[in-house]
Amino acid sequence: MYGFRLLALFCIANLASPAYARVDTVYTGHQQLAKNVDQEYNYRVIETALKLTEPEFGDYKIIVQGDGDIPKQRALEQLLKINGAFNVVLVPTQPEWEEKAIPIPIPVRMGLLNYRFLLTHKDKLATFGTIHTLETLLPLRVGLRKSWATWEVMQQQGFNVVNAYSYDTLFSMLDMNRFDYIPRGIYEIYDELKSRRLDYPNLVIEPNLVLVLPTPYYAFVSPHAPRIAERLTAGLTMMMEQGILRNMLYQHYGEALEQANIGARRVIHIKNTTLSEETPLDKKHYWIDLFNASLTP
């Protein structure tokens, strides 16, 4: 379905396109770029996909819009506008994004966000020692933001979800016992805790559990930029098939993966019923299996 929709948009756009060479310009938000290791990875993915497709598509440039983090809903609004601030955004997939923008169903982090550790208060550790199944985890209060992809998923699965109105208040609310834990990606949680150690010395990473919740991280393109979508699809496919994306993943997140020692933890699987039929779950080489993978490319 995505491929047909993208082809139609691309053909329509090119009916009015001049024959001379063009420069493909990607407009993306500051939160997509080199503010930290996580955002630097997003930038390198975009840049590499564009670079690999130069022989077919020609020159390109990347323009950064804004000077700070952009809320996801505002980013989507800009993505959908003609001449909006962005024409490419990388985020965990959600139904609204797939319906309104052009999704490129290639998981740019190879499912690394599927694996989540729990940030909690040290006084709660004994409680988590008794958790071995999804059924025993459900009654505990989980802190999330409504804009996160995990919100709808965990709501549907019967979790006791508590809303935090901003990213920063999550940590203060956890410290004040407003909820019991925050599930965070294994490549996120260590830096998040380290940067807040002085403010919240009682917050810790629960040492024995890992949640596995399928959360593909896609590039989304404006419906007004079908050529960019066509180009990124080609570039990301090359990156995946040639092992470039996997190598990049280990370069950026290898240290966090080694620190995680995920194989020693009890595993709780959570279904993601919001995923579309286009999710490439059958393409095993698109996904990293941390329980059976080497920590080198």
Residue ranges and their predicted role:
Residues D67-L137:
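Acidic, polar ligand-binding/catalytic clefts
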Residues R145, A149-Q156, L236-T296:
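Ligand-binding clefts/hinges and TM-proximal coupling segments of bilobed small-molecule sensing domains
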